[in-house]
Amino acid sequence: MSKKRVHELGKQLKEQGIELSNQELVEKLHALGYLEVKSHSSSLEDDQAHAAYEKILAERKPKPAPARPSGPGFVVRKRAHVEPPTVTAPAAPPSPEPEYAEPQYAEPQAEQAYEPEPQAAQPEAGAEPAAAPEPPAEAAPLAAQAAPSPGAEAAAPAAPQAQPAQPAAPAAPPAPTAQPSAPPPAAAQPRPPQPSAPSRPPPPGYRPAPPPGARPPVSAAPGAPGQPGAAGQPPRPPVDPRTLRPTSTQAVVISRPLVPVRRVTPPTSARQQFPVAPGPRALGEVRELKVVPGSLGREREFIDVSRDKRRGRQPGRPISEEQAKSLSGKELLQAAISDRAYIPIRGKKKKPTKKGAKTQITEKAEHKKVIRIEESISVSELSQVMGVKASDLIRKLMQMGKMVTINAQIDADTAATLALEHGYTVEKKGFEVEEFIPEVEVDESKLVIRPPVVTVMGHVDHGKTSLLDAIRQADVAAGEAGGITQHIGAYSVNTPQGPITFLDTPGHEAFTAMRQRGAQVTDLVVLVVAADDGVMPQTVESIKAAKAAGVTILVAINKVDKPQAAPERVMQQLTEYELVAEQWGGTTIMLPVSARTKQGIPELLEYIALQSEVLELKANPDKLAAGRVIEAKLEKGRGPVATVLVEEGTLRVGDALVTGVHFGRVRAMMNERGEQVDNVGPGYPVEVLGLSGVPVAGDEFDVVEDEKAAKEVAQHRATKQRQKELGGVKKATLEDLFAKAKTSAQKVLNLVVKADVQGSSEAVSQALEKAATKKVGVKILESAVGAITKSDVLTAAAGNAVIVGFNTKPETEIENIASQQGVKILMFGIIYEAVDRIREEMAGLLEPIIKEKPLGKAEVRQVFNIPRVGQIAGSAVTEGVVKRAGHVRVVRDRKVVFTGKIGSLKRVKDDVREVAQGFECGIGVDGFSDVKQGDVLEVYELEEIRQSLD
């Protein structure tokens, strides 16, 4: 159902003559029960608006507006008394004549009550008679004054009868503005009105009218000529009006309104006759006047339009060019003034002033009171949408037990609670990722066998990379720092059983996330356990990660060629973690292998192929590619480089790719041997170039239709991630306040971590954060991939941080900038070396413990005052040794009166560093000159002891 605004309702009422201001209309609607209306822009349903319109119209019935005039203005005529001409005619019986009532000029209804003259019966083409409005209530007294005699009232009903035409009269066309003539005497027949043009020559027998003083008086008594009571009297002789002279002109304006000007003159074709009371006077010259505005627009003037009528120009219409040529300048001016008769005259509109101006109360529409958010919204954004001060929202949140700032993110439920108090509702809007990344149904006919993905996991130094080197017939382990793997590597190996994709994961405890990612994307897990070392912590962690991912575990007991190898002991230890060998009746395959002698490697590959057949690994290569990011890094000259594993579809160069908050178009792809490839099928790893940033290892990637769709998905994920990071608002508890106060007193080491790959950056950051203790904390200001840049140095300088570089080095220029800024750069290639060095930096932040170490005592025997030197205490060393660099306490009567440092130490006249027990010396105390005989000087030194982190 449609709606109507309040100001539209006001316009509709104004058309009916009811003028209400916006505020008055709002108050009126409130009085009628429409309390939801707040201002002129508020909306009402159509049925409500119609009901309110009818109620207001019923309460304030406007007076009927007078009819719109069809003519140019009022018509005011002048009348002259004429004597009927003497006409010799044969005697004839008098015929009944119509009776006339007194004319009522102000009554539009009088026009409707009488028939027009015969010559006006044929109107002009296209002219329509104007409908007369209803007579106003005040017309009755006027009619009573116009017809005071009872006879006139009795003659009124006979007025509507039509006047008979006079056949003997000449057929002269009447003027366009000819008006109804007065009724003839009782003995005369009605005649058509005479034209008022004075230019015609007088007929023969013309004689001037007698002067006004010689005219007999008109009697108003009943029975006098022209009165209703004279119906039975003999008629007076007719008088030719052309023989009479017109009297003085008298203009009468009947019921002229002020503004707007209303004209009641009907068109010429529809003009009606107005009967007048019979009397001795007849119509003479007729002048037509029109009411027009004055020259200044503040008054009214009467303009004679009779001459315009005689010249064939209709009043109130603009003159043509031909007519303008025949008029003088004065006549043109008068015509221009007369054309302004229809211009409404209004007073000057007053400019609105600020003083006294009422404030319009506006309110948003209901459909605008809906706030749509996704996961969260900031306090500032919510305040702007609702038009509420942010401080009020923060105060309300504090009352709810939530400590927030103006830029803090609040969840949708909290926002809904705040919005409900201000009349708003909150709706969660979702971003449908399925619109860009649709799910494709599996078509069994298009599935093909893909290579198995095998992840090699285990403890550090148990030979995982060496085992892969033996399978690939390569030597990757020799090139790794410290002989340990610190990156996750992906290799595709062609074996007699078919292609197999291997993922090599680090075994160090810091690379837990890498091992978990490897377990998530794999089909099989080869758990490598050293036969001489047994099950270790990272071995147990790898077992848990594989079981959590729900993948099959195949155990390879490595280093069986060593003399101290004990495979049986390893198998026994694995049973504690529900891994029972097939030889012992279990379901887990356990093979003894040796990476050095390549013992058991063919059997391992055969078991991998057998397990892949059991799992029925298939994929559809015809669909859009999808998979996971295994590793990512930032290389100079190449930009962001991501190592991805294609799980479904085929990845091609030029595809639009989106992963996490990054997107791009595949510019190039390279396999593990550095060879460029154009497409990669499911089950194979590849390096991808062309992303907008370094993605997070472990994120999924998808190929979409175009780069625009990829950008939209990435931007949505970035916004959602930011809202999630800022949206964590927790209730403030007393425990949190105590913990915060305790943390504020804790020393914190700020770090900026830069690594060669994203996985190493993540692992190093986690390892360094775990090194924090109760005394010293570790805060990672920034963790990124790539070389150390000037921006990293400036960030570290601003945060008083140390830069940790892992497998990356800064340029010489960057080292100079760091030296100028006082920033320390530490570079490492092995992760445990980085952890040990950072612990030393953390210990350096702790203030050392000051410990007092006694040296000796001396007794003052004599005091010497030496000019320009000061007071010297001649003392004898009674205990230990007195050193010149030591501290001293002056003890008098077992009370310490001063604590300071020894300023000078002499023996006889020589300065000495120390004086042993049993010798005398002179001791000068800095800042103290009140040494007395008998005082004891206790000498000691302060020793700093470095605190431990534990």
Curated annotation (Swiss-Prot):
Q: Which CDD domains match?
A: IF2_eIF5B, IF2_mtIF2_II, mtIF2_IVc
Q: Where is this region: G5?
A: 594-596
The UniProt keyword set, sorted, is:
Cytoplasm, GTP-binding, Initiation factor, Nucleotide-binding, Protein biosynthesis
Q: Name one GO molecular function term.
A: translation initiation factor activity
Where's it found, cell-wise? Cytoplasm
List the HAMAP family. Answer: IF_2_B
The name on file for this protein is Translation initiation factor IF-2
Q: Which organism is it from?
A: Anaeromyxobacter dehalogenans (strain 2CP-C)
